[in-house]
Protein backbone atom coordinates (compact mmCIF):
# COMPACT_ATOMS: atom_id res chain seq x y z
CA UNK A 1 0.00 0.00 0.00
CA UNK A 2 1.29 3.46 -0.87
CA UNK A 3 2.26 5.65 2.05
CA UNK A 4 -0.29 8.28 2.92
CA UNK A 5 0.51 11.78 4.03
CA UNK A 6 -0.60 12.53 7.57
CA UNK A 7 -2.08 16.01 7.79
CA UNK A 8 -3.13 16.26 11.42
CA UNK A 9 -3.24 14.24 14.63
CA UNK A 10 -5.66 15.16 17.38
CA UNK A 11 -6.54 13.59 20.71
CA UNK A 12 -8.80 10.89 19.26
CA UNK A 13 -8.32 10.93 15.48
CA UNK A 14 -5.72 11.21 12.73
CA UNK A 15 -6.43 12.86 9.37
CA UNK A 16 -4.69 11.62 6.24
CA UNK A 17 -4.72 12.93 2.70
CA UNK A 18 -7.68 11.38 0.89
CA UNK A 19 -7.63 9.25 -2.28
CA UNK A 20 -9.78 11.76 -4.16
CA UNK A 21 -9.46 15.55 -4.49
CA UNK A 22 -11.25 17.37 -1.67
CA UNK A 23 -11.35 14.33 0.62
CA UNK A 24 -9.60 13.19 3.79
CA UNK A 25 -9.29 9.85 5.55
CA UNK A 26 -10.34 10.11 9.21
CA UNK A 27 -8.75 7.43 11.42
CA UNK A 28 -10.23 6.74 14.87
CA UNK A 29 -7.74 6.01 17.67
CA UNK A 30 -8.22 4.14 20.93
CA UNK A 31 -6.57 6.98 22.84
CA UNK A 32 -8.74 8.66 25.45
CA UNK A 33 -8.21 12.05 27.04
CA UNK A 34 -10.10 14.18 29.54
CA UNK A 35 -9.77 17.60 31.16
CA UNK A 36 -8.01 19.04 28.08
CA UNK A 37 -5.59 16.08 27.87
CA UNK A 38 -4.54 16.30 31.54
CA UNK A 39 -5.83 12.74 31.92
CA UNK A 40 -4.83 10.19 29.29
CA UNK A 41 -5.47 6.52 28.68
CA UNK A 42 -6.40 3.89 26.12
CA UNK A 43 -9.86 2.37 25.71
CA UNK A 44 -9.41 -0.83 23.74
CA UNK A 45 -11.70 -0.94 20.70
CA UNK A 46 -12.97 2.62 21.15
CA UNK A 47 -11.82 3.70 17.70
CA UNK A 48 -13.63 0.84 16.00
CA UNK A 49 -16.86 1.53 17.87
CA UNK A 50 -16.72 5.30 17.38
CA UNK A 51 -16.13 4.84 13.65
CA UNK A 52 -19.25 2.70 13.37
CA UNK A 53 -21.40 4.83 15.68
CA UNK A 54 -20.41 8.09 13.98
CA UNK A 55 -21.04 6.55 10.54
CA UNK A 56 -24.51 5.43 11.62
CA UNK A 57 -25.49 8.79 13.13
CA UNK A 58 -24.06 10.85 10.26
CA UNK A 59 -25.98 8.72 7.76
CA UNK A 60 -29.22 9.07 9.72
CA UNK A 61 -28.74 12.84 9.91
CA UNK A 62 -28.02 12.96 6.18
CA UNK A 63 -31.33 11.21 5.54
CA UNK A 64 -33.23 14.12 7.14
CA UNK A 65 -31.30 16.71 5.16
CA UNK A 66 -28.51 17.66 7.57
CA UNK A 67 -25.38 18.34 5.47
CA UNK A 68 -22.30 16.52 6.82
CA UNK A 69 -18.71 15.91 5.79
CA UNK A 70 -19.22 12.12 5.90
CA UNK A 71 -18.81 10.21 2.63
CA UNK A 72 -18.44 6.53 3.55
CA UNK A 73 -16.75 4.15 5.96
CA UNK A 74 -13.58 2.62 4.53
CA UNK A 75 -12.75 -0.07 7.11
CA UNK A 76 -12.99 -0.79 10.83
CA UNK A 77 -11.17 2.36 11.89
CA UNK A 78 -11.35 4.74 8.95
CA UNK A 79 -13.90 6.77 7.06
CA UNK A 80 -13.73 9.00 4.01
CA UNK A 81 -14.83 12.58 4.66
CA UNK A 82 -15.01 15.78 2.66
CA UNK A 83 -12.29 18.31 3.35
CA UNK A 84 -13.83 21.34 5.04
CA UNK A 85 -12.58 24.56 6.58
CA UNK A 86 -13.20 23.90 10.27
CA UNK A 87 -14.81 26.73 12.22
CA UNK A 88 -12.77 27.00 15.46
CA UNK A 89 -15.80 26.71 17.72
CA UNK A 90 -17.10 23.75 19.71
CA UNK A 91 -20.89 23.86 19.87
CA UNK A 92 -22.37 22.23 22.99
CA UNK A 93 -26.10 21.50 23.14
CA UNK A 94 -27.44 20.74 26.62
CA UNK A 95 -30.76 19.09 27.47
CA UNK A 96 -30.01 18.02 31.06
CA UNK A 97 -27.67 19.73 33.54
CA UNK A 98 -24.38 17.85 33.88
CA UNK A 99 -20.63 18.32 33.86
CA UNK A 100 -19.30 21.86 33.73
CA UNK A 101 -22.79 23.40 33.63
CA UNK A 102 -23.64 21.87 37.00
CA UNK A 103 -20.31 23.02 38.43
CA UNK A 104 -20.52 26.56 37.03
CA UNK A 105 -24.12 27.31 37.88
CA UNK A 106 -24.73 25.09 40.90
CA UNK A 107 -27.52 23.16 39.18
CA UNK A 108 -27.83 19.57 40.46
CA UNK A 109 -26.65 17.07 37.88
CA UNK A 110 -29.61 15.39 36.21
CA UNK A 111 -31.88 18.46 36.32
CA UNK A 112 -33.95 18.65 33.13
CA UNK A 113 -33.40 22.07 31.55
CA UNK A 114 -36.47 24.20 30.68
CA UNK A 115 -35.29 24.18 27.08
CA UNK A 116 -32.23 23.08 25.15
CA UNK A 117 -29.31 25.45 25.70
CA UNK A 118 -26.52 26.08 23.19
CA UNK A 119 -23.03 27.04 24.40
CA UNK A 120 -19.92 27.94 22.40
CA UNK A 121 -16.29 27.23 23.23
CA UNK A 122 -13.27 28.60 21.37
CA UNK A 123 -11.08 25.71 20.17
CA UNK A 124 -7.73 26.54 21.74
CA UNK A 125 -5.94 23.97 23.89
CA UNK A 126 -3.51 26.55 25.30
CA UNK A 127 -6.48 28.51 26.67
CA UNK A 128 -8.40 25.39 27.79
CA UNK A 129 -11.16 25.99 25.21
CA UNK A 130 -12.81 29.00 26.91
CA UNK A 131 -16.55 29.60 26.70
CA UNK A 132 -17.38 32.48 24.35
CA UNK A 133 -20.50 34.31 23.22
CA UNK A 134 -21.88 34.72 19.71
CA UNK A 135 -20.66 38.33 19.88
CA UNK A 136 -17.09 37.12 20.47
CA UNK A 137 -17.38 34.71 17.55
CA UNK A 138 -18.62 37.29 15.04
CA UNK A 139 -16.46 40.17 16.35
CA UNK A 140 -13.24 38.18 16.01
CA UNK A 141 -14.21 36.79 12.62
CA UNK A 142 -14.31 33.12 13.59
CA UNK A 143 -17.73 32.90 11.93
CA UNK A 144 -20.12 35.36 10.30
CA UNK A 145 -23.61 36.21 11.50
CA UNK A 146 -25.02 34.10 8.66
CA UNK A 147 -22.70 31.22 9.61
CA UNK A 148 -24.01 31.40 13.18
CA UNK A 149 -27.63 31.46 12.02
CA UNK A 150 -26.95 28.27 10.06
CA UNK A 151 -25.08 26.67 12.97
CA UNK A 152 -27.89 27.37 15.46
CA UNK A 153 -30.55 26.09 13.04
CA UNK A 154 -28.61 22.91 12.28
CA UNK A 155 -27.67 22.32 15.94
CA UNK A 156 -31.28 22.43 17.11
CA UNK A 157 -32.41 20.11 14.29
CA UNK A 158 -29.59 17.69 15.09
CA UNK A 159 -30.52 17.78 18.77
CA UNK A 160 -34.20 17.15 18.09
CA UNK A 161 -33.44 14.19 15.86
CA UNK A 162 -30.75 12.58 18.03
CA UNK A 163 -32.80 13.04 21.22
CA UNK A 164 -35.61 11.02 19.67
CA UNK A 165 -33.32 8.44 18.11
CA UNK A 166 -31.52 7.71 21.39
CA UNK A 167 -34.70 7.75 23.47
CA UNK A 168 -36.06 5.09 21.13
CA UNK A 169 -33.29 2.74 22.30
CA UNK A 170 -33.58 3.66 25.99
CA UNK A 171 -30.86 6.32 26.13
CA UNK A 172 -31.15 9.95 27.29
CA UNK A 173 -29.06 12.43 25.28
CA UNK A 174 -27.91 14.65 28.15
CA UNK A 175 -25.65 16.91 26.10
CA UNK A 176 -23.21 16.70 23.21
CA UNK A 177 -20.44 18.61 21.45
CA UNK A 178 -20.30 19.08 17.68
CA UNK A 179 -18.18 20.99 15.21
CA UNK A 180 -18.99 22.58 11.88
CA UNK A 181 -16.99 23.46 8.80
CA UNK A 182 -17.29 25.40 5.58
CA UNK A 183 -17.60 23.18 2.52
CA UNK A 184 -16.56 24.99 -0.63
CA UNK A 185 -17.92 23.82 -3.98
CA UNK A 186 -16.55 26.15 -6.65
CA UNK A 187 -17.66 29.61 -5.47
CA UNK A 188 -20.47 28.30 -3.28
CA UNK A 189 -20.04 27.70 0.45
CA UNK A 190 -22.30 25.93 2.91
CA UNK A 191 -22.00 25.04 6.57
CA UNK A 192 -21.81 21.30 7.24
CA UNK A 193 -21.55 19.08 10.32
CA UNK A 194 -17.96 17.83 10.70
CA UNK A 195 -15.80 15.85 13.15
CA UNK A 196 -17.72 12.93 14.74
CA UNK A 197 -20.72 12.03 16.89
CA UNK A 198 -19.97 9.25 19.36
CA UNK A 199 -19.85 8.47 23.10
CA UNK A 200 -16.61 10.49 23.10
CA UNK A 201 -18.51 13.74 22.61
CA UNK A 202 -22.02 12.87 23.85
CA UNK A 203 -23.27 12.39 27.39
CA UNK A 204 -25.53 9.34 27.21
CA UNK A 205 -27.44 7.98 30.20
CA UNK A 206 -29.56 4.87 30.44
CA UNK A 207 -33.18 6.09 30.45
CA UNK A 208 -34.19 3.82 33.35
CA UNK A 209 -31.15 3.82 35.63
CA UNK A 210 -29.26 7.01 34.62
CA UNK A 211 -26.15 4.84 34.30
CA UNK A 212 -23.51 6.69 32.30
CA UNK A 213 -22.76 5.18 28.88
CA UNK A 214 -20.10 7.58 27.60
CA UNK A 215 -16.61 8.99 28.21
CA UNK A 216 -17.63 10.19 31.69
CA UNK A 217 -16.88 6.62 32.76
CA UNK A 218 -13.25 7.34 31.85
CA UNK A 219 -13.24 10.91 33.20
CA UNK A 220 -14.62 9.83 36.57
CA UNK A 221 -12.88 6.45 36.88
CA UNK A 222 -16.20 4.57 36.90
CA UNK A 223 -14.79 1.53 35.09
CA UNK A 224 -16.42 -0.61 32.38
CA UNK A 225 -15.74 2.03 29.73
CA UNK A 226 -15.41 -0.44 26.86
CA UNK A 227 -18.64 -2.18 27.87
CA UNK A 228 -20.53 1.14 27.90
CA UNK A 229 -19.44 2.02 24.36
CA UNK A 230 -20.32 -1.50 23.22
CA UNK A 231 -23.77 -1.20 24.81
CA UNK A 232 -24.47 2.03 22.90
CA UNK A 233 -23.46 0.34 19.64
CA UNK A 234 -25.54 -2.72 20.52
CA UNK A 235 -28.67 -0.67 21.21
CA UNK A 236 -28.23 1.19 17.93
CA UNK A 237 -27.95 -2.19 16.19
CA UNK A 238 -24.44 -1.63 14.85
CA UNK A 239 -22.09 -3.63 17.08
CA UNK A 240 -19.52 -5.19 14.72
CA UNK A 241 -20.00 -8.89 14.18
CA UNK A 242 -16.46 -9.54 15.41
CA UNK A 243 -16.34 -10.48 19.06
CA UNK A 244 -15.19 -7.93 21.59
CA UNK A 245 -11.82 -9.67 21.78
CA UNK A 246 -11.25 -8.60 18.16
CA UNK A 247 -12.29 -4.98 18.65
CA UNK A 248 -8.76 -3.60 18.46
CA UNK A 249 -8.94 -3.72 14.68
CA UNK A 250 -6.08 -3.14 12.24
CA UNK A 251 -3.24 -0.79 13.00
CA UNK A 252 -3.00 2.45 11.06
CA UNK A 253 -1.52 2.07 7.60
CA UNK A 254 0.79 4.84 6.45
Swiss-Prot record:
Q: In which pathway does it act?
A: Purine metabolism; IMP biosynthesis via de novo pathway; 5-amino-1-(5-phospho-D-ribosyl)imidazole-4-carboxamide from 5-amino-1-(5-phospho-D-ribosyl)imidazole-4-carboxylate: step 1/2
Reported EC number(s) for this entry are 6.3.2.6
Q: What are the GO BP annotations of this UniProt entry?
A: 'de novo' IMP biosynthetic process; cobalamin biosynthetic process
Q: Which GO terms describe its molecular function?
A: ATP binding; phosphoribosylaminoimidazolesuccinocarboxamide synthase activity
Using the record, list the residue span of the signal peptide; answer none if the entry has no such feature: none
Q: Which InterPro entries match?
A: SAICAR_synt/ADE2_N (IPR028923), SAICAR_synt_PurC (IPR033934), SAICAR_synth (IPR001636), SAICAR_synthetase (IPR050089), SAICAR_synthetase_CS (IPR018236)
Alphabetical keyword list: ATP-binding, Ligase, Nucleotide-binding, Purine biosynthesis
Tell me which family the UniProt entry assigns to this protein: Belongs to the SAICAR synthetase family.
HAMAP family with a match to the protein in the record = SAICAR_synth
Kindly provide the name given to this protein in its UniProt entry.
Phosphoribosylaminoimidazole-succinocarboxamide synthase
Amino acid sequence: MARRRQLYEGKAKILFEGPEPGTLVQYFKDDATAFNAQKKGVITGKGVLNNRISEFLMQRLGEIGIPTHFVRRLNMREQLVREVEIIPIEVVIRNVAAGSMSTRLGIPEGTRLPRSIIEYYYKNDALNDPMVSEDHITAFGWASTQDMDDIVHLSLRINDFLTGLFLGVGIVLVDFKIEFGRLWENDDMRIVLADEISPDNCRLWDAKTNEKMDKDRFRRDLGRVEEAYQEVAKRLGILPEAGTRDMKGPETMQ
